């Protein structure tokens, strides 16, 4: 199993290109099942989760072809993928494939909407809380699907197609909104999605569906209206920049000091996180084609933060921000409101010398003067990159084990950091 070795202490200097967002690319790829025509997606990151989803789509009979890159992308970053679901041979998504990644469960929506049936294994993947699929299935039932659980599989059917309906989510759910959008796009009549997620990745999916012929209004607000159509066509769409990768590298710069320009990204995708970062004393400047992050002199100030759905502070940046706060001046209180069991990184940060106390959904972080390198173990995707951030500032060497988590969500991480002066290397098993 691969390991990453980091010798801390070097400030980051230079430029980092931001990849396409995995959390946008996955639902966009799944949406290709809604049509028999070709959907071409540009700026798709090269990640383990992308490869896993291509295998799942291939199992259904979807053809895919990698056709090129965007100008400026290197051999290790970015790709353009053409997906054609003109010969879907199977509407079953088996356990051995779905268990590798939670988002693959979303194939239930386009399979059901287009073919009238889907049999999809209950999901696996990330170990963050329970993440139930109840809200996703509720949305499909509201649209007229019959749902059964049989032997660990969700069996969804509709006799005469899905029909437009009002879907009211009791809490904001990104996955539920993705599923509702895809299913409602081919439903008969009008669907109204209340308490819809407003995340940029939801907006990106709706933009692609619109190019395919869907009729969608209100995306980016809590109320989305979808007028169903009888068929969708092909489209070309570029995946939006990864706001979580953007925030991660911004926090790495704040942690180590230095001056880095994050290219190919947009500040409006993560205003809340950048505002919090600025409050710590880090200089954040929006540029026409990116963001400049700079911190010189004194360390960062302690800041309290609470995770919230977009446009609030992203839960996917909570672990990274906690790593930054381990060396802040004073005490920081970090409250996690989205997922339970999302403090698994705390124990590993403590191995580096961090002082963190947990009380339910609250983490209290007392900043320390220095961290010291040690062997640590990644427990999930965001926790693993928080250890990278801490390791970049720790004295001596930090060895991160189980880095396959990183490969699920961060494209060419060692290369991007290394080009900015980080002493980081991968030891391959």
UniProtKB/Swiss-Prot annotation:
Residues involved in phosphoenolpyruvate binding: 22-23
Pfam families to which the protein is assigned, alphabetical: EPSP_synthase
GO biological process: cell division; cell wall organization; peptidoglycan biosynthetic process; regulation of cell shape; UDP-N-acetylgalactosamine biosynthetic process
Active site, UniProt feature: 126 (proton donor)
Metabolic or biological pathway, per its Swiss-Prot or TrEMBL entry: Cell wall biogenesis; peptidoglycan biosynthesis
Record key words, sorted: Cell cycle, Cell division, Cell shape, Cell wall biogenesis/degradation, Cytoplasm, Peptidoglycan synthesis, Pyruvate, Transferase
PANTHER family per UniProt: UDP-N-ACETYLGLUCOSAMINE 1-CARBOXYVINYLTRANSFERASE
Similarity comment: Belongs to the EPSP synthase family. MurA subfamily.
Name under which the protein is recorded: UDP-N-acetylglucosamine 1-carboxyvinyltransferase
Phylogenetic placement of the source organism: Bacteria, Pseudomonadati, Pseudomonadota, Alphaproteobacteria, Hyphomicrobiales
Gene symbol of the encoding locus: murA
């Amino acid at each position: 199993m691969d390991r990453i070795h980091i010798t801390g202490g070097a400030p980051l200097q230079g430029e980092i290109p931001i990849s396409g967002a995995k959390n946008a690319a996955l639902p966009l790829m799944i949406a290709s099942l809604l049509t028999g025509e070709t959907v071409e997606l540009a700026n798709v990151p090269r990640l383990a989760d992308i490869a896993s989803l291509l295998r799942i789509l291939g199992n259904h009979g979807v053809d895919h072809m990698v056709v090129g890159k965007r100008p400026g992308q290197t051999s290790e970053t970015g790709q353009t993928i053409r997906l054609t679901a003109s010969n879907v041979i199977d509407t079953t998504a088996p356990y051995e494939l779905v268990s590798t990644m939670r988002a693959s469960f979303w194939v239930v929506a386009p399979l059901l909407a287009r073919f009238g049936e889907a049999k999809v294994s209950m999901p696996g993947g990330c170990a963050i809380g329970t993440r139930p699929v109840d809200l996703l299935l509720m949305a499909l039932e509201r649209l007229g699907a019959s749902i059964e659980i049989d032997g660990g599989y969700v069996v969804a059917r509709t006799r005469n197609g899905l029909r437009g309906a009002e879907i009211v989510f009791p809490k904001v759910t990104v996955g539920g909104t993705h599923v509702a959008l895809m299913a409602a796009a081919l439903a008969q009549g009008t669907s109204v999605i209340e308490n819809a997620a407003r995340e940029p990745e939801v907006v990106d999916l709706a933009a692609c569906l619109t190019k395919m012929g869907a009729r969608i209004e209100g995306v980016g607000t809590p109320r989305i209206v979808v007028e169903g159509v009888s068929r969708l066509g092909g489209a070309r769409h570029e995946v939006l920049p990864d706001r979580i990768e953007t925030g991660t590298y911004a926090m790495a710069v704040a942690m180590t000091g230095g001056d880095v320009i994050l290219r190919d990204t947009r500040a409006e995708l993560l205003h809340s996180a950048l505002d919090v970062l600025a409050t710590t004393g880090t200089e954040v400047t929006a540029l026409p084609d990116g963001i400049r992050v700079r911190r010189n002199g004194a360390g960062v100030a302690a800041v309290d933060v609470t995770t919230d759905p977009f446009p609030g502070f992203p839960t996917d940046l909570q672990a990274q921000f906690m790593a930054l706060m381990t060396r802040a001046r004073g005490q920081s209180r970090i409250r996690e409101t989205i997922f339970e069991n999302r403090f698994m990184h705390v124990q590993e940060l403590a191995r580096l010398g961090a002082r963190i106390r947990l009380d339910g959904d609250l983490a209290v972080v007392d900043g320390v003067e220095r961290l010291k390198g040690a062997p640590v173990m990644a427990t999930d995707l965001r926790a693993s990159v928080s250890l990278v951030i801490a390791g970049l500032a720790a004295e001596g060497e930090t060895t991160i084990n189980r880095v396959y988590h990183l490969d699920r969500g961060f494209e060419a991480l060692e290369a991007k950091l290394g080009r900015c002066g980080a002493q980081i290397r991968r030891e391959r098993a």
